[in-house]
A protein has these predicted regions:
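Short S/T/G/P-rich N-terminal loop/turn motif that feeds into the first structured element of a domain
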Residues: 20-257
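Positively charged n-region of N-terminal signal peptides that target proteins for export
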Residues: 1-4
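C-terminal motif of bacterial Sec signal peptides marking the signal peptidase cleavage site
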Residues: 14-18
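Sec-dependent N-terminal signal peptides
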Residues: 6-10
């Protein structure tokens, strides 16, 4: 099984269909705490890529996963909102444990990968050097579950400013929770939720890990824009900028399993 040792900074630097039943899509979408591992695999489009050909390989992949009986909670596709260098989209897999992840990958590479490579030839490709796994901690669940297979996703790659640290982050999160409660009391519940992501791979001297990764998710673009408008009026942005420096990377997401 491939060892995950790639750096978060590499991930940051290069960043700028068909679905199954509603129950499994919900697991892929709403980030249940049972997802102990979230894995991101970079993909590039091939010469024969189209929405139709991609939908066919998604169906093929789901059939292969079902046939092998892997312990997997769901899967998503993330498409960057701006053109980036290094990949065209990211295939995300949600696992109940690292043991389940490793067992599935080991079996897949030995027994299934050849068939999969034939199925995706000309449509898309991936490099196993660009696989990144994280342990998620859900900090706030959505008040209104997303009933669609689409969502908006934003990573915040952050480093603490000098003389600041995790205690400052915790204090900010407490204020942020109060802000979300007040906003929902005024405007009604919404689909926003967020997750702290701990990398399950090592950084290097040339490419160290960020201090923390904050992942925000919304039901749609309108909800995201409304959330940002409220946030801008709250004064929290200035507080966040005081203790850390972050880079945002945004995607549109679609649950495929």
């Amino acid at each position: 099984m491939k060892k995950i040792t790639l750096s978060m900074v590499v991930l940051l630097g290069l960043m700028a269909c068909s679905s199954s039943n509603d129950e499994t899509v919900a697991v892929a979408r709403d980030g249940q705490p049972a997802n102990e591992v979230v894995e991101y695999v970079w993909h590039s489009k091939g010469a024969n890529y189209s929405e139709e050909s991609f939908a066919l390989v998604v169906d093929k992949w789901n059939d292969l996963i079902d046939a092998q009986g892997y312990q997997m909670n769901g899967a998503n596709i993330l498409t960057p909102l701006v053109e980036v260098e290094g990949y065209d989209f990211i295939w995300v897999m949600l696992w109940p444990s690292m043991d389940a992840r490793n067992a599935a990958w080991d079996h897949w590479m030995t027994n299934v990968d050849s068939e999969w490579q034939d199925a995706i030839e000309g449509v898309m490709s991936f490099d196993l050097n660009n696989v990144f796994a994280f342990e998620p901690t859900v900090m706030r669940n959505a008040s209104v579950p997303n009933q669609t297979d689409a969502f908006e996703n934003e990573f915040n790659f952050c480093d603490f400013n000098e003389s600041f640290g995790f205690n400052d982050l915790k204090m900010f999160q407490a204020e942020f929770a109060d802000f979300l409660d007040e906003t929902e009391a005024r405007d009604g519940p919404d689909g926003y939720w967020y997750v702290m992501m701990d990398p399950l791979f090592e950084g290097t001297a040339e490419a160290p890990l960020n201090d923390y990764l904050w992942l925000s998710l919304w039901t749609d673009v309108e909800e995201k824009m409304t959330g940002y408008e409220n946030y801008a009026l709250s004064g929290l942005a200035a507080k966040a900028d005081k203790f850390s420096t972050c880079r945002r990377v945004s995607f549109s997401g679609k649950a495929i399993r």
